[in-house]
Curated annotation (Swiss-Prot):
Binding site for L-aspartate: 119, 123-124
UniProt xrefs under Gene3D superfamilies: Argininosuccinate synthetase, chain A, domain 2, HUPs, Single helix bin
PROSITE patterns with a match to the protein in the record: ARGININOSUCCIN_SYN_1 (PS00564), ARGININOSUCCIN_SYN_2 (PS00565)
Keyword Nucleotide-binding among UniProt keywords: yes
Protein name, entry field: Argininosuccinate synthase
Domain of life: Bacteria
GO biological process terms held by the UniProt record: argininosuccinate metabolic process; L-arginine biosynthetic process; urea cycle
NCBIfam families, per database record: argG, PRK00509.1
A GO term, aspect molecular function: ATP binding
Annotated family: Belongs to the argininosuccinate synthase family. Type 1 subfamily.
């Protein structure tokens, strides 16, 4: 009986070629697994049939849109997940979900190995392989693009020699990864840092300079979960999808950054994440109203560590699980409404209300009704600066 290899199948050039290559070079049966993460584009049945046409003995499509939104995007919202304070982890949070379903498929179909199409330069090889080490360590891992130094030209030549049906051509300029949480674009002329992105780079967002009328939105949260938009109840997936449309129409969520990859190189990335950025900014604003100062300060460090761990492929790590527990506890009172305006590429917060608010109008006001006892301030200031004052006297030789 032949070995069975479960392949993470995107429908693109590299993984389509990988089906035939694995079958031929490893004398194995290939089971292609494609995960619907709300990426849009091609119909998933078309993707499934392409895998079969390339030689897969089985081609499985998993509709994981709600699972992705609830179990991966939502924790990112609660953690204000932004790698290097910018990137909302578009690809990084999708990989552990793909790993989960591949491991399940390998178990169900008696797979002996798993395969991916990642190169040796990227982060995804780490995310996949560390993920498998944590969920299915008994499986062999095959990475033909990395281990056999495939290039796009080599992949196309192999496809032509073996009559593999592919739609990509040598003129395809970009590498693109997308899901409902966002879209990542790299390579091509973008590798020259001085080249500005042209309009064909973007698909999820309109040009911010188009002059659309501002769009005012009210996002309601319950314990950190977005539950309504403009008073209409929504699921997490529906919230992301609606804000992708509305924020995307305003050019919100475009990012152009030079990113520090896990493997040690810098990479220029273009991201579009209109729904993700809107939800994260709204969530940050809700936390600012409802989380106590010391907890908020500490959580900012936890959020940054959480984002780094997820980016680095450590979704299944003990530290990540512990941080999840801390973050979940911090969300108890993150409930209320945030009003914001989407316009010309900007997210402008202009209203906040919550029954759990720590904002006390009578303490904050400078007008009539001020209840703040200012007589307490002098002693507070003296004590707050006392240790610094003593150190300064020592340094000046007057202690």
């Amino acid at each position: 009986m032949k070995d069975r290899v479960v392949l993470a199948y995107s429908g693109g050039l590299d993984t389509t070629v990988a089906i035939s290559w694995i079958a031929k070079e490893r004398n194995a049966e290939v089971i292609a697994v494609s995960i619907d993460l709300g990426q849009g584009g091609e119909d998933m049945e078309t993707v499934r049939q392409r895998a079969l046409g390339a030689g897969a003995v089985e081609s499985i499509v998993v509709d994981a849109r709600d699972e992705f939104a609830n179990d991966y995007c939502l924790p990112t919202i609660k953690a204000n997940g932004l790698y290097m304070k910018e990137y909302p982890l578009v690809s990084a949070i999708s990989r552990p979900l793909i790993v989960k379903h591949m491991a399940e498929a390998a178990k169900e179909h008696n797979g002996t190995a798993v395969a991916h199409g990642c190169t040796g330069k990227g982060n995804d090889q780490v995310r996949f392989e560390v993920g498998f080490a944590n969920t299915a360590p008994e499986l062999e891992i095959i990475a033909p693009a990395r281990d056999y130094a495939w290039t796009r030209d080599k992949a196309i030549a192999f496809a032509e020699e073996n009559n593999i049906p592919i739609e990509q051509s040598k003129s395809s300029p970009f590498s693109i990864d997308q899901n409902v949480w966002g879209r990542a674009v790299e390579t091509g002329y973008l590798e020259d840092l001085w080249n500005a992105p042209t309009k064909d780079v973007y698909a999820y967002t309109e040009d911010p300079a188009l002059g659309q009328a501002p769009d005012e939105v009210i996002i309601s949260f319950e314990s950190g979960v977005p539950v309504a938009i403009d008073g209409r109840k929504v699921t997490v997936l529906e919230a992301i999808e609606e804000l992708n449309r509305r924020a995307g129409a305003q050019g919100v969520g475009r990012l152009d950054m030079v990113e520090d990859r896990l493997v040690g190189i810098k990479s220029r990335e273009i991201y579009e994440a209109p729904g993700a950025m809107t939800l994260i900014r709204a969530h940050e604003a809700m936390e600012a109203v409802t989380i106590e100062r010391e907890l908020a300060r500490y959580k900012r460090g936890i959020d940054a560590e959480w984002s780094d761990l997820v980016y680095d492929g450590l979704w299944f790590s003990p530290l990540k699980r512990s941080l999840d527990a801390f973050i979940e506890e911090s969300q108890e009172h993150v409930t209320g409404d945030i009003r914001l305006v989407l316009h010309a590429g900007n997210i402008i917060i202009n209203g906040r209300r919550s029954d759990h608010s720590l904002y006390d109008f009578n303490l904050a006001t400078y007008d009539e009704g001020d209840s703040f006892d200012q007589s307490l301030a002098k002693g507070f200031v003296e004590l707050h600066g006392l240790s610094s004052k003593i150190a300064a006297k020592r340094d000046m030789g007057i202690l």
